[in-house]
C-alpha cells in the first residue's frame, strides 16, 4: 500500500481557472489535483487532495492526516495563511513534514499577504511558481521523507 501525502487547498482555490487568471493562471483545481496525483505517483506515493473554504474543516483535514499516519502534507491555505494561528497550531500539533505552497508570489503582492503563519509550521515554503509549485513541493517532500522516484537509482 502506497504511503499517502495530503494536499490541502484553502478558501477560493475551488475557483482556480476563473478567479483572477492574471494572478493565478487558467489552470483549475482539477488540474492541480491531477498534477499532484501524477507527481506523487512518480515517487510511489498517493495524493489525497482536499479543498475547503472553511478554516475548521481544513484543521479537521490536518487532524485526519495525523490519524491516518500521512507521510506528509502540502498546504495552500490561501488567505488563511496570513490570518490563521489555528491552522499553524494544527500543523505543529500533528508534527507531519509539511510544505506550504502559494501559486502567486505573496511577497510581491499586498503587504497583508507578506506574513504567513502556516509557513512557520512548514519545513519549506514555495511561492510564485504557479501551479508548478505543487510539483516542486511534492518533490521536496518526497526527498524529506525518503521516497525515491520510480526508476531512479538509489545512491549507496
From Swiss-Prot:
It catalyses: 3-dehydroquinate = 3-dehydroshikimate + H2O. The keyword Nucleus does not apply. The active site is at residues 24, 102. Pathway: Metabolic intermediate biosynthesis; chorismate biosynthesis; chorismate from D-erythrose 4-phosphate and phosphoenolpyruvate: step 3/7. It comes from the Bacteria. Its EC number is 4.2.1.10. The keyword Lyase applies. GO terms for biological process: amino acid biosynthetic process; aromatic amino acid family biosynthetic process; chorismate biosynthetic process; quinate catabolic process. It holds the Pfam family DHquinase_II. GO terms for molecular function: 3-dehydroquinate dehydratase activity. Keywords: Amino-acid biosynthesis, Aromatic amino acid biosynthesis, Lyase. Gene3D superfamilies: Dehydroquinase, class II (3.40.50.9100). NCBIfam families: aroQ, PRK05395.1-2, PRK05395.1-3, PRK05395.1-4. HAMAP family: AroQ. Catalyzes a trans-dehydration via an enolate intermediate. Belongs to the type-II 3-dehydroquinase family. This is 3-dehydroquinate dehydratase. It comes from Nitrobacter hamburgensis (strain DSM 10229 / NCIMB 13809 / X14). The lineage of its organism: Bacteria, Pseudomonadati, Pseudomonadota, Alphaproteobacteria, Hyphomicrobiales.
Amino acid at each position: 500500500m502506497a504511503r499517502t501525502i495530503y494536499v490541502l487547498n484553502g478558501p477560493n482555490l475551488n475557483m482556480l481557472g476563473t478567479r483572477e487568471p492574471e494572478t493565478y493562471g487558467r489552470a483549475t483545481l482539477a488540474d492541480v489535483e491531477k498534477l499532484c496525483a501524477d507527481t506523487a505517483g512518480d515517487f510511489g506515493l498517493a495524493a489525497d487532495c482536499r479543498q475547503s473554504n472553511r478554516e475548521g474543516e481544513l484543521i479537521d483535514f490536518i487532524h485526519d492526516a495525523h490519524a491516518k499516519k500521512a507521510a506528509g502534507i502540502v498546504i495552500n491555505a490561501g488567505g488563511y495563511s496570513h490570518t490563521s494561528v489555528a491552522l499553524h497550531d494544527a500543523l505543529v500539533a500533528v508534527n507531519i513534514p509539511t510544505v506550504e505552497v502559494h501559486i502567486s508570489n505573496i511577497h510581491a503582492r499586498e503587504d497583508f499577504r507578506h506574513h504567513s503563519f502556516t509557513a512557520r509550521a512548514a519545513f519549506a515554503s514555495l511561492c510564485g511558481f504557479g501551479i508548478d509549485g505543487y510539483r516542486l513541493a511534492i518533490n521536496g517532500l518526497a526527498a524529506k521523507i525518503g521516497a525515491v522516484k520510480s526508476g531512479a537509482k538509489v545512491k549507496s
